[in-house]
Amino acid sequence: MKDHEYHALTDAFFQYVEDTVDAGYPDIDCERAGGVLTLSFENKTKVIINKQEPLHQIWVATRENGFHFELQGESWIDNRFGHELKTLLSKACTTQAGEPVQFP
């Protein structure tokens, strides 16, 4: 994948996350600074999503672990545990928010 393709895909994903949070989860604060998107919860925990441009990956840090996602076909898949990005993000945000959060 070329750098411009990577940036288009990751920018679209970051926008999707922001739009989903803004539309349905007023208790989650979403802030983007450059290649980092931070989701902050009322209990002071965070989920941090960031671009890893040299590797063409998306990294996610949760309260429980760190994950490295690579594009496989149409999905971002964690290269260690095999989790799909939206599924993992839904689970992590649900755990940290203490209420159901979905990224369909």
Curated annotation (Swiss-Prot):
InterPro entries referenced in this protein's UniProt entry, alphabetically: CyaY, Frataxin/CyaY, Frataxin/CyaY_sf, Frataxin_CS
Record-level GO cellular component terms: cytosol
GO molecular function, one term: ferrous iron binding
CDD domains: Frataxin (cd00503)
Pfam assignment, any one: Frataxin_Cyay
UniProt keyword terms in alphabetical order: Iron, Metal-binding
Coiled coil: none
Keyword Metal-binding belongs to the record: yes
Cell inner membrane is among the record's keywords: no
UniProt GO BP: iron-sulfur cluster assembly
PANTHER family (alphabetical): FRATAXIN, FRATAXIN, MITOCHONDRIAL
Described purpose of this protein according to its UniProt entry: Involved in iron-sulfur (Fe-S) cluster assembly. May act as a regulator of Fe-S biogenesis.
Family under the similarity heading: Belongs to the frataxin family.
Protein name: Iron-sulfur cluster assembly protein CyaY
Organism: Aeromonas hydrophila subsp. hydrophila (strain ATCC 7966 / DSM 30187 / BCRC 13018 / CCUG 14551 / JCM 1027 / KCTC 2358 / NCIMB 9240 / NCTC 8049)
Gene for this chain: cyaY
